[in-house]
Structure formats: structure tokens, C-alpha cells
């Protein structure tokens, strides 16, 4: 096995017995693939079914009302974005590109005859159709400078669905759901009548729809019911027994007798195949029935007197005595009736027709019109147009390819072509037929929670729908413009207004429910947010109406949606996460991968199955035992089939799971020993990992699952090598790789990677990249070159490994509290940097412009000390709460001054009397260091000194960066050709003769540009130098072009909002150490709050003097049932012990041979998966050992982790007791504790619930206008509410004076509180109480009801 650059530095020992079959697919593909499909930029690759292409093709051509103009779509192009991703974030712009559509305007001769079209002119041009947001490489969008994610939606798939309402007997219903257009419902009531609804409006008889489709009453009956023939004569009535085989399984309502009156089949018996044979053998072709039975029947077809043409009875009329007489009179002795005798099937439609008062198609169309447009007078043309527009015109109604496929599959017919997206008559007839079958018990209702009936709508599809909405509005505008614009040479751009498209897309990205502010606490929260699948949003469910069933875990979730990761609270089960290996197919259905089983042998062939396909197969678990030939070891194995867990013969198995972790999401797959935890706690563990704050120093988990490197790689926070090569240069800002062109598919000689430094994330955490390679290191494509935030050697590192003791300590771990050692604070283990952004905006007001200036009235010099001459804080300044960040003045209205004030003003020349200080100040409770300032100004007033200074610094930095980049390219080109050309014969060179040998000394005197002008006799060498020359010149041009583009973007004017003159952004870095009140958690849902930070000397310690880092309450485990944390602690202790063993070996010797022996014991003595140490050279072995001193990292994959025996064996090798317990001593007394304590290493996280963000105190502040009570909440700088329950508590204690103080002067007694303040100032300790303002509010509200209530000031004595 080969190891990557980062893996060689620190190999993770892997447990788990299952073979590695399939790599976890790229975690962000659900976002990137979907948008790529929507935005096929490369026309050469074909845009046949790409999103934009298909929408444009469906919307065009557009024809003018008079038929003179036709606008056709030809092609589209997407331009280059104005700014790159970083620039957009800085400027608060949207990362988008212009969409230019090539349109062809065909002009016809207006004088030509109506039916013939003579083309007069064709005009083509590209028309700007708005800006389309582009997706960044990490699957996000930058909208107005903030990074956003569009969450995928799980919604009901288009198609036909059948359901049952349990509240009513026989209440079955069918619904045809299109991709866009009107919904059509059919439903049974308790009487067996079939009703229809369009768009959930008023119901009407289902047969009205059929008549509107053109069916007659006779045809409707023929389609939905069997008919039987009755003969009658003087002896009575007889029923012909035609199609006996169709009667199988039906209940007989009469005896069947033969010619000798022997009963062959008795009444009230279900007819069997044997009975049918008996009847045929006896030659019985008809059976006598009585009039009572005949009178329940109805006529199947119109009965017409052939002689006169008179209609005796219509189809569906009841068979009555008078009807029979009329038939006899005209010589008709047989009658075709609807078969209610042998089956009830025909009665539903027959009864419905009885309720249906319409007689023909026109009446049916009018009835539908009245339902949909009540109050509108029905005109013949509009009635027909309305009905056709509902289901039969593709621009208004579309099932889409998904809906057509589902509808055909559900009705079990392929009569309708897959390319027809509107409804056909056979679809509607088929749905009603299936509904009748279900009512008769011959079909099954659908499970709407089955993932075969729910599909994922990803970002590309949602933007496509928004684009379609915008384009529909544009289309209407084009039609109007064609008839209004009168121009000699009309061009496409004269009649196209693209604003509706821009508006529709902007609305979706800025205010759509599924376009969300990216969760950017750490790399895992980013990845999880992009893989989230929500059932909420437009066209989805609402959390208030969603029941238990839709939220519950369904059997089809297996391998598709994670059964664990979902929010707690009202959204539980409605927001899910994609499982590790799941993917979305072309139809939007979720698929899971399986290994194919052929003739009892498990192959490595992978097939993805959707939930619909999976129902038909028997699937074995990933942990099923196989022999060396991949055959099943056991004859009876546990499998899944049709959503049930079953035991079955191994010969029946058709597929097998790919991996044990395929059923859980990426976040759940990061939890070691997940299989030993209760699901509720795992849910908390998975959710809390997303809230972990990245710390100053990242540390890998000693006990991981092997998923850490996959999440870190796919999150896009690490820098990954694009090509094979050697590290040429490294510093904190960039990494330069000299590319090995022979092993890489690129002509670039150099790859330069710029690192992100101290950038603010969406959650105010700090994004910073650190290189992990050194100059001279050889790297392969895909190797990690630099760690991002919360990653360590390319592995996700959300927290730190701490030595944990499960023991109580003086009540400081009561109720999940956590006792921490001071060492953790000293070592900055959980110190995190948070970057806050403060914005100051200078606007143009009615009274004049606001001004950002250092000249502020009534502010001391010391307050302005940290500002520059422009009134903006210096970079590097340490700012405290209340310090001015940006000094700003706002004009105020002129006041009438007294003569004395005017005199004083004149004497002291005070000009700033008519302005008020509106500076941006540091909020309370925060302090930090200013790390960056950005100034944005509009062009009108010219640029300020600070803005010009920042601009100059940015241009200088860019010039320096590009110069250095070019210098690197020069040195790489030099070194690549120097070895080849030294000693070669010259063809032509300035200063040397032809045929001379080129020396190193001669080259040293020339610049590289002159080197490349030398020509050589050797053709191959000449070609190589020619290639280097071309590359060098191209690189020079490219770098100059890049610099000019960068310079242009830096100096380009800023588009500020209307009325805004200047915007200043100040970024302050705040360092937060861990302290009591901060929330911490493990990965098993074991969360708690830090109760105390204890000096190291007081912490319990081991026999060798090592103090523990954390004391956790052992009572927090039994009731929570998250035993995984105990196993993690044991395995973590073993890992620590192995690290100590390696450290001791290193202290004795640094010989590679000795170290290899120790590593062999550590890595390969326990567990099935071995580490190939032979793949590492001696130097790599030494580096590996140095990196393992703190502990050997271990991977224990979920559902395939380390067993108890493995942990015990490792503890033994590490030099610890196999029960993981040890004697601890009290740090304060030095005495041992009574019993041995479980001690181990656990990975603990600091969560983004920091006490600094929550603690808040107020003495004075703002009041509510109406009640005059202090505001509430930290954001409003509010007070502490003294609510009803607190008042009752004081009442219960009889604390009258305290209560009076709380309800009056400390709250809303305006006069009282002012007097109280005055008394305190004067040193008087008395309290004057007046009426609280809230009483006045109550009094006024009561007065509004017409009741005069007032306060009685008189005392009882009076």
C-alpha cells in the first residue's frame, strides 16, 4: 500500500475487518454536478438536455400578434465574471457572469397573403439576458458578499399516487401531480360515487371529466364495466353465461343448475376454476334469474327502435317493468345490461353517472368552467380553451420525464410515449380504473414516504425553474414590444427586456427559503450544510402540518438518507443528511451502491439502485462473512428484502452492501464506536460536531474513524496538489511547486498556490491556512500541501485529546458540569480567534452629508488617539469596549441660540455646533486587535487619504506577488534547461562562435531572456529550448495581464447603495480562551458546561505524577447509554501508551532498525489490517516516530470498529491495566482515592456557545416607548425581566418593599426613577413612588373599551 505525503508523516492504525471496496464519492457532488448540468458552458460538449438550453428552447420562438415577427433562439454564451470570488466577498458584490443569448429575428412580408409567409429579413445578434450567479469550486454562491448554500429539497415526485383516508370507509383517492401545472384528484365517497377535483377546488362528478374529453355515456360504461345479456320470455328471465373465466373469484347471487335441475354451484359461493369446468362440462350456457334481481340492473347501451329510430332507453337507465314492456312491443327479447350480478365493479361508474347531470361534452366543459371560474359567464371558446390549457398544453402543464416515467410505471402501461409530457385520455382513464381496482381490493395504495415516491430537487433544477419564471415574463414583454415598437430596422435587443430574469434569480438567491447563509463554524459544518436535504420550502411540507409518518425513518432511507443526523426540535425528521455513499440519479431519485452477487459469489462490480429497484432484490449486509473466494460462509444469512429484515438462504442473495458506514452521513461516520451509543445521543454528537469552534492549534483525534481525511479533503479548506512535482518554495503566503511535466498532464512548469490568511468566516471564526510541506519535498497529485482551519495533516481536527477521569470532584461535575485543569488554558488548547466585522456608513441626509473625520466635537484627545487623520482606527490598535473605531459626524437641525451662547461661540470660534457625534464604537463586552480596514467610496467626492493608502498597499503587494511569481518561473525554467544546455554545441549565440561549447560561466553572465535566444545544433535540444522560450514568454504576458486585471479591480470604483457616500469596514480579531460557562462536548452527545478551571496541582494525578486534564461525572453515562465514550477513553489511553513506548525507544536510540521493530509491534501485532512499513525509508521512519510521541492515531470505522479484545491487547502493549482503570491521588492532600478510576484519552470539542457571547449586564440603558420599561436581550442592551413568577415568589415571602421597588422605580415609574437618581446623587436614601407607566397603558386600553378607570390617590383615613 502506498501512502500520501501527509499520511507518511503520521500513519493511522486502522481496525476493521471489512475489505475496502469503494471510495467515498466526492462529498459536494450533489451541489457541483447539479449546477454544472444547469450551466453547460461548453457548447461543443452538447447542451441537449442541459437546464438553460432546454428552458430557452421551450420558450422560443415567440411570434407577434399580427404574425409579422418571429423571434428564435440560436445559442447562448456565459461571459467572464467581473470580480473573482475573494474580491466579491471584500466588495460585497455577487459572484456572477453575464448571460448573452443569440436571438434571430425573422421579419415576414406584411403584405403577403394570410396563409403564406414570405421572409423579408433575418437579423441576428447577442442580447444580454441578465447575470447568472456562478458556483464557487466548493459548491457555494457569493451573493452580496456573503457565502450562501442552496439546500436540496426532498419533495413528492410527479406522477400518479393512490391513498386511503382512514377516517372514512372506502375513501380511496388518486392524485395526478405534474411537475408544473394543475393537480387532478379523484376520490370515492362513502356511497361509492367517484368525484373529481382540479387544484383542490369544489368537487364534481368524475364522469364530467371523461365527458369533457369527448367520451359519450355509452363509451364511459363500456370502458369501466362488463356487460351481460338477459333474455326474457313468458317463462321468465335468463342470464347468458358468457366469459365464465372472467367470473372466477366472484360471489354468485344465484344457484347454477343443469338441464335436470341439479345444482352445480350453490348461491353465495365464490366461483373457482373447478366450478367453471363443471359448468362447461354440463353444457350450461344460461341461468334463470328472478325479476327482483333484474330490477336492480341498468341498461349498458342506448336502446333504439330500429324501425322508427326512437330511443326507448338511454345507457345507464334502470331496467323497469315499463322498459321491458316497451322492448317486447318492438320485438326485442334480449337486453344488454351492466353486469352488477357477477361483479360490483361497474356500479361505481354507473352510480356516478346517475349523479352527473351533464349529457354531453359541451355541458361537461361548462360545468368545469363554473367550478374553476365561479361567477364568470361561460363563453364557448373560453370554456374549451380553459380545459385544454389545464392538462393538454405543454407550456402550461408538464409531467416532465420523471412524471411520465412514474405515471407509465404506476399504470403498468407504455401506451403513451416517454416524450409526451402532457396528459393523454388513456392516462385519466387508467388512473380511474386503477382507483376502482384498489377499491375492489385488487391493487395497493402508495406509501408516500417511500423514497421511490419522493425525489430530490437540487440547486441546478431550482435555478432553472426560477429562470423559467423570469423568461415567461420576458416572453410576454417581447409580444407586447413587437406590437408597440415601430422602427425601420427592428433588432432583437430593442424588444427584449431582461430585468424580469434578473429579478426572479435575485429573489431566489437572496430571500428564497432554501438559499441559506452558509454554516461555516468548521469544515464539517460546511460539508454537512451542502449535503442537507430539506422537506421544507416552496412546494414542500410545512413544519406545522407534517405528521409523525413523514418525519420517521423509512426502510428506504437505508444507504440514502442518514437515520441519525437530523435537528432536534420542530424540524426533526424534515431536514435530513445524505448518507456517505448516496448519489442522486438523473431523475432526482436517491440511489445507494451495492456489490453484485453472481451465482453465490460476491463480485467487486458496483451497481447503484434506487429505492424502487431495491424493493425487488434480496440484499446482504456488508458484515456478512465471506471465504477467500468471496462466497458466503454461512447458508442462512441476515438480509433485507422489500423493506424487511429477513433470514434467508445465501443462494437467494442478489446484492451486498458496499461498506458498513454506507447507511450513515459524513458527520455520523466521524463518531468512533457509534455502534455502542444510543441513537438519541449519536444524533446530538453528530449535530454538536458541527458547532465545534476551530482552535488556535489544531490537533488530530487519537481515536478516529478514518473518515477525517475524506471530510477535510472534500471541504475545500486544505490546499491539494494539482500535479506531481517538487516543492520549490514555501512561506506563509504561498507554496510553489516545480511540476514534473513527464508525470503530469500539463505543460505548466510551475504551480503556485496562494494561502488564505486570517479571513473571517460566516460565523466569525478565523480561516487560516498553514503549509505542511518543506522545500525539496516530492509531492504527488492529490497530496495535501497546506492545512486549513480545523485540520491537522489533512485530517479534520475539531478539538483536542484530553486525559479524562470519570470521577466526581467536590460537586464540580454535578449535572454534566466539567472540571478543567488550568494546564489546558495555559497551553492555549481551546483558545480560538474570532474576527468581528464592524461597518460604518456615511450617508447623504436631508440636512447635509455625514462626514467621516477625526474632528469631532466634545471628544477628548485620548479617545481619538487610536485614529488616523481620516478618523479611522489604525491597523494593529488594541481596542476596548467603547473605543471609537470610525469617527463620524451627522448634521443636525439648526437651534435657536441665546445671545449669550452666540457671544461665546463667536469668542471661541466653535464651528461644529450643528453636528452630532455618530461614531462607530466598539460594543460593550468586547475587546481585540484591529487586523484590517477596508474603505469604499463613491466617485463623486474623490478618494480620501486612507483609501488611497490602502489602494497603494494592495497594488504594491500585488506587484510584489506577481514579481515573485515570475522570479520563481524564471528560476524553474533556468534549472530545467541549464543541465541540458551546458556542454552543448552552439548553432548561433551573441559573443560565441558557431560550434563552440556552452559553459556554465558564460551562462552566468547572461539574463534568462538572452539564454533563450541561443540556438543549438542538436535538434532535440533546440526543440526543448524552443518550448521553454514559448512557456517563458507566455508566462510573462500572462503575469502582466493578471497584474493589470488585479490593478484594475483594486482601483475600480465601488458601487454603493443609493444615498451612501462612504462605507468603512473594520475587522477586529478577538482572542477567546476557555473559561467557566463555556460549553464543551465529546463526540457521543456527552455535553456539559465548564464549571471550574482548577490549578494543575489540585487535579487528581496518576502514580507517576501525571495530572488528569478533565474530571467528568460517571453518572452521566448509564442513563444516556452512550457507552462509546468509555471505549474511546480506553482506546485513547492505549494510543497514548503506544506513543510513550515509541518515545522511550527514541530516547534510547534513533536507529531506524530498532524503531521499525517497535513500530511493527505497535501497528501490526493487533488487528487484521497491517501497515506496510517497508514502503517508508529510514528518514521517513524517524519523522513518523517523532510525530507519534503524543500518541498513535487509531481509526475504528463505524459498525466495523475495534473489538474489546483488541483494546485490551493494545492497553497491554501500551503498559496499562487491561481494565483501563488506575489508582489516582488527590492533588490537594496527596492521598489515594478509595477506588480505582477509569482514566483515558477522549477527544473533546469547544462548542460555539461561549459565555462571552451570552453574558451581559446593564445598569442604565434604553427604554421601550410604550411601556417605558427597559428593553430585553443582549442585542438591545436590555435589562433582566422580573416576570410574573418572580413577583409571586416575592409575594409569597411578603417582601413588600422589595416588590414595590422592582415594580416601580427599577422599572417604569418615570418620575420615581428620576427622583431616585437625584436622591442617590444628593446622598438621600429615600424612595418616592409614583404610578408605573404600564398602569397608565392599561388604563388607556380600558378607556378604549368605554370604561373610565382611574387611580384613586386618596388614603383610607380620609
Swiss-Prot record:
Family named by the database record: Belongs to the RNA polymerase beta chain family.
Source species of the chain: Francisella tularensis subsp. holarctica (strain LVS)
Gene: rpoB
Cysteines paired by S-S bonds: none
Stored CDD domains: RNA_pol_B_RPB2 (cd00653)
Keyword line: DNA-directed RNA polymerase, Nucleotidyltransferase, Transcription, Transferase
Keyword Transcription among record annotations: yes
One Gene Ontology term, aspect cellular component: DNA-directed RNA polymerase complex
Reactions this protein catalyses: RNA(n) + a ribonucleoside 5'-triphosphate = RNA(n+1) + diphosphate
Assembly and oligomerization: The RNAP catalytic core consists of 2 alpha, 1 beta, 1 beta' and 1 omega subunit. When a sigma factor is associated with the core the holoenzyme is formed, which can initiate transcription.
GO molecular function, one term: ribonucleoside binding
Its job: DNA-dependent RNA polymerase catalyzes the transcription of DNA into RNA using the four ribonucleoside triphosphates as substrates.
Gene Ontology biological process: DNA-templated transcription
Its EC number(s): 2.7.7.6
Full protein name: DNA-directed RNA polymerase subunit beta
Family matches, as InterPro entries: DNA-dir_RNA_pol_bsu_ext_1_sf, DNA-dir_RNA_pol_bsu_external_1, DNA-dir_RNA_pol_su2, DNA-dir_RNAP_su2_dom, DNA-dir_RNAP_su2_hyb_sf, RNA_pol_bsu_bac, RNA_pol_bsu_CS, RNA_pol_bsu_protrusion
Amino acid at each position: 500500500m502506498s501512502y500520501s505525503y501527509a499520511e507518511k508523516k503520521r500513519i493511522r492504525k486502522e481496525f476493521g475487518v471489512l475489505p475496502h471496496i469503494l471510495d467515498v464519492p466526492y462529498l459536494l457532488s450533489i451541489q457541483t454536478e447539479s449546477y454544472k448540468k444547469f450551466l453547460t458552458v461548453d457548447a461543443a460538449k452538447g447542451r441537449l438536455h442541459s437546464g438553460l438550453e432546454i428552458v430557452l428552447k421551450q420558450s422560443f420562438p415567440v411570434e407577434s400578434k399580427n404574425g409579422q415577427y418571429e423571434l428564435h433562439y440560436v445559442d447562448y454564451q456565459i461571459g467572464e465574471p467581473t470580480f473573482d470570488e475573494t474580491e466579491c466577498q471584500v466588495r460585497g458584490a455577487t459572484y456572477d457572469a453575464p448571460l448573452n443569448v443569440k436571438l434571430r429575428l425573422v421579419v415576414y412580408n406584411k403584405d403577403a397573403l394570410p396563409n403564406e409567409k414570405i421572409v423579408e429579413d433575418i437579423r441576428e445578434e447577442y442580447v444580454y439576458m441578465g447575470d447568472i450567479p456562478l458556483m464557487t469550486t466548493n459548491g457555494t454562491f457569493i451573493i452580496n458578499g456573503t457565502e450562501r448554500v442552496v439546500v436540496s429539497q426532498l419533495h413528492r415526485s410527479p406522477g400518479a399516487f393512490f391513498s386511503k383516508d382512514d377516517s372514512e370507509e372506502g375513501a380511496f383517492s388518486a392524485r395526478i401531480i405534474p411537475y408544473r401545472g394543475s393537480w387532478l384528484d379523484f376520490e370515492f365517497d362513502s356511497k361509492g360515487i367517484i368525484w373529481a377535483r382540479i387544484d383542490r377546488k369544489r368537487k364534481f362528478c368524475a364522469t364530467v371529466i371523461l365527458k369533457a374529453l369527448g367520451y359519450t355515456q355509452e363509451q364511459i360504461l363500456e370502458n369501466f364495466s362488463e356487460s351481460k345479456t338477459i333474455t326474457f320470455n313468458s317463462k321468465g328471465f335468463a342470464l347468458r353465461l358468457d366469459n365464465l373465466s372472467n367470473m372466477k373469484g366472484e360471489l354468485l347471487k344465484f344457484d347454477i343448475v343443469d338441464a335436470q335441475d341439479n345444482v352445480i354451484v350453490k348461491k353465495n359461493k365464490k366461483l373457482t376454476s373447478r366450478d367453471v369446468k363443471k359448468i362447461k362440462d354440463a353444457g350450461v350456457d344460461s341461468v334463470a334469474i328472478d325479476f327482483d334481481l333484474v330490477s336492480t340492473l341498468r341498461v349498458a347501451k342506448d336502446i333504439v327502435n330500429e324501425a322508427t329510430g326512437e330511443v326507448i332507453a338511454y345507457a345507464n337507465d334502470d331496467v323497469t317493468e315499463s322498459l321491458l314492456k316497451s322492448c317486447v312491443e318492438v320485438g326485442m327479447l334480449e337486453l344488454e345490461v351492466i353486469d352488477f350480478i357477477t361483479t360490483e365493479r361497474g356500479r361505481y361508474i354507473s352510480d356516478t353517472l346517475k349523479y352527473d347531470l351533464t349529457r354531453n361534452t359541451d355541458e361537461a366543459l361548462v360545468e368545469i368552467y363554473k367550478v374553476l371560474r365561479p361567477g364568470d359567464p361561460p363563453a364557448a371558446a373560453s370554456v374549451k380553451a380553459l380545459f385544454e390549457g389545464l392538462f393538454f398544453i405543454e407550456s402550461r402543464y408538464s409531467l416532465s420525464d420523471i412524471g411520465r416515467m412514474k405515471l407509465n410505471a404506476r399504470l403498468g402501461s407504455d401506451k403513451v410515449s416517454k416524450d409526451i409530457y402532457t396528459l393523454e385520455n388513456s392516462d385519466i382513464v387508467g388512473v380511474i380504473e386503477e382507483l376502482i381496482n384498489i377499491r375492489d381490493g385488487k391493487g395497493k395504495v402508495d406509501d408516500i414516504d417511500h423514497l421511490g415516491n419522493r425525489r430530490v430537487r437540487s440547486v441546478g433544477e431550482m435555478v432553472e425553474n426560477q429562470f423559467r419564471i423570469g423568461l415567461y415574463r420576458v416572453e410576454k414583454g417581447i409580444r407586447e414590444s413587437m406590437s408597440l415598437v415601430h422602427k425601420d430596422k427592428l433588432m432583437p435587443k430593442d424588444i427584449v427586456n431582461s430585468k424580469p430574469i434578473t429579478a426572479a434569480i435575485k429573489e431566489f438567491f437572496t430571500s428564497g427559503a432554501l438559499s441559506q447563509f452558509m454554516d461555516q463554524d468548521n469544515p464539517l459544518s460546511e460539508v454537512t450544510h451542502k449535503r442537507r436535504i430539506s422537506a421544507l420550502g416552496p412546494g414542500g411540507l410545512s413544519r406545522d402540518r407534517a405528521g409523525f409518518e413523514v418525519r420517521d425513518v423509512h426502510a428506504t432511507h437505508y444507504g440514502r438518507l442518514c437515520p441519525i443526523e437530523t435537528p432536534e426540535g420542530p424540524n426533526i425528521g424534515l431536514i435530513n443528511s445524505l448518507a456517505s455513499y448516496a448519489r442522486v440519479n438523473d431523475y432526482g431519485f436517491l440511489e445507494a451502491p451495492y456489490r453484485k452477487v453472481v451465482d453465490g459469489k460476491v463480485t467487486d462490480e458496483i451497481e447503484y439502485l434506487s429505492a424502487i429497484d431495491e424493493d425487488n432484490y434480496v440484499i446482504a449486509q456488508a458484515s456478512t462473512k465471506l471465504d477467500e473466494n468471496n462466497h458466503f460462509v454461512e447458508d442462512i444469512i441476515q438480509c433485507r428484502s422489500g423493506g424487511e429484515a429477513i433470514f434467508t438462504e445465501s443462494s437467494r442473495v442478489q446484492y451486498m452492501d458496499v461498506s458498513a458506514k454506507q447507511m450513515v452521513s459524513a458527520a455520523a461516520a466521524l463518531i468512533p464506536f457509534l455502534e455502542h451509543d444510543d441513537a438519541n445521543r449519536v444524533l446530538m454528537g453528530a449535530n454538536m460536531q458541527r458547532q465545534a469552534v476551530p482552535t488556535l492549534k489544531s490537533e488530530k483525534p487519537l481515536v478516529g474513524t478514518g473518515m477525517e481525511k475524506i471530510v477535510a479533503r472534500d471541504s475545500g479548506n486544505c490546499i491539494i496538489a494539482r500535479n506531481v512535482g517538487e516543492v520549490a518554495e514555501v512561506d506563509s503566503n504561498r507554496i510553489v511547486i516545480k511540476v514534473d511535466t513527464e508525470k503530469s498532464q500539463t505543460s505548466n512548469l510551475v504551480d503556485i498556490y496562494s494561502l488564505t490568511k486570517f479571513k473571517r468566516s460566516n460565523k466569525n471564526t478565523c480561516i487560516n491556512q498553514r503549509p505542511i510541506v518543506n522545500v525539496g519535498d516530492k509531492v504527488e497529485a492529490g497530496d495535501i500541501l497546506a492545512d486549513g482551519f480545523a485540520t491537522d495533516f489533512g485530517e479534520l481536527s475539531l478539538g483536542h485529546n484530553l486525559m479524562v477521569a470519570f470521577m466526581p470532584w467536590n460537586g464540580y461535575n454535578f449535572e454534566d458540569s466539567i472540571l478543567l485543569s488550568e494546564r489546558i488554558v495555559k497551553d492555549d488548547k481551546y483558545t480560538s480567534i474570532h474576527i468581528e466585522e464592524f461597518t460604518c456608513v456615511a450617508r447623504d441626509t436631508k440636512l447635509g452629508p455625514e462626514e467621516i473625520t477625526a474632528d469631532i466635537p466634545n471628544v477628548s484627545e485620548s479617545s481619538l488617539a487610536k485614529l488616523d487623520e481620516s478618523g479611522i482606527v489604525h491597523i494593529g490598535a488594541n481596542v476596548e469596549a467603547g473605543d471609537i473605531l470610525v469617527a463620524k459626524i451627522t448634521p443636525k437641525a439648526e437651534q435657536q441660540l441665546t445671545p449669550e451662547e452666540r457671544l461665546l461661540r463667536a469668542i471661541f470660534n466653535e464651528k461644529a455646533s450643528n453636528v452630532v457625534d455618530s461614531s462607530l464604537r466598539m460594543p460593550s463586552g468586547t475587546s481585540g486587535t484591529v487586523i484590517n480596514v477596508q474603505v469604499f467610496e463613491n466617485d463623486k467626492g474623490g478618494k480620501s487619504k486612507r483609501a488611497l493608502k490602502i489602494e497603494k498597499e494592495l497594488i504594491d503587494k500585488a506587484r510584489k506577488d506577481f514579481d515573485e511569481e515570475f522570479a520563481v518561473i524564471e528560476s524553474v525554467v533556468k534549472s530545467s534547461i541549464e543541465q541540458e544546455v551546458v556542454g552543448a554545441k552552439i548553432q548561433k549565440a551573441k559573443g560565441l562562435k558557431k560550434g563552440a561549447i556552452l559553459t556554465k560561466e558564460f551562462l552566468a553572465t547572461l539574463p534568462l531572456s538572452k539564454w533563450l535566444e541561443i540556438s543549438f545544433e542538436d535538434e532535440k535540444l533546440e526543440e526543448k529550448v524552443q518550448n521553454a522560450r514559448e512557456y517563458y514568454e507566455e508566462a510573462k504576458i500572462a503575469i502582466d495581464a493578471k497584474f493589470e486585471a488585479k490593478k484594475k479591480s483594486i482601483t475600480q470604483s465601488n458601487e454603493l447603495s443609493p444615498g451612501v457616500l462612504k462605507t468603512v469596514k473594520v475587522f477586529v480579531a478577538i482572542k477567546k480562551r476557555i473559561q467557566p460557562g463555556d460549553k464543551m462536548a465529546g463526540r457521543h452527545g456527552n455535553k456539559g458546561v465548564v464549571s471550574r478551571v482548577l490549578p494543575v496541582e489540585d487535579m487528581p494525578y496518576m502514580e507517576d505524577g501525571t495530572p488528569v486534564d478533565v474530571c467528568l461525572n460517571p453518572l452521566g453515562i448509564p442513563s444516556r447509554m452512550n457507552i462509546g465514550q468509555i471505549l474511546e477513553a480506553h482506546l485513547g489511553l492505549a494510543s497514548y501508551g503506544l506513543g510513550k513506548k515509541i518515545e522511550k525507544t527514541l530516547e534510547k536510540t534513533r536507529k531506524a532498525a530498532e524503531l521499525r521493530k517497535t513500530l511493527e509491534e505497535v501497528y501490526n501485532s493487533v488487528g487484521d489490517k497491517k501497515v506496510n512499513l517497508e514502503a517508508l525509508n529510514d528518514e521517513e521512519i524517524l519523522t513518523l516516530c517523532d510525530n507519534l510521541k503524543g500518541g498513535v492515531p487509531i481509526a475504528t470505522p463505524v459498525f466495523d470498529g475495534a473489538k474489546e479484545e483488541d483494546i485490551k491487547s493494545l492497553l497491554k502493549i501500551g503498559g496499562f491495566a487491561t481494565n483501563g482503570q488506575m489508582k489516582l491521588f488527590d492533588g490537594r492532600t496527596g492521598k489515594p482515592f478509595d477506588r480505582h478510576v477509569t482514566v483515558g484519552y477522549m477527544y473533546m470539542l469547544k462548542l460555539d456557545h461561549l459565555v462571552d457571547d451570552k453574558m451581559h449586564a446593564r445598569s442604565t440603558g434604553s427604554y421601550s416607548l410604550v411601556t417605558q420599561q427597559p428593553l430585553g436581550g443582549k442585542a438591545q442592551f436590555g435589562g433582566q425581566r422580573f416576570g410574573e413568577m418572580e413577583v409571586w415568589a416575592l409575594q409569597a415571602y411578603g417582601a413588600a418593599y422589595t416588590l414595590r421597588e422592582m415594580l416601580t422605580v427599577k422599572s417604569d415609574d418615570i418620575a420615581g426613577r428620576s427622583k431616585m437618581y437625584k436622591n442617590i446623587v444628593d446622598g438621600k436614601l429615600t424612595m418616592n413612588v409614583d404610578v408605573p407607566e404600564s398602569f397608565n397603558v392599561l388604563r388607556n386600553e380600558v378607556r378604549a373599551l368605554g370604561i373610565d378607570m382611574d387611580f384613586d390617590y386618596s388614603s383610607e383615613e380620609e
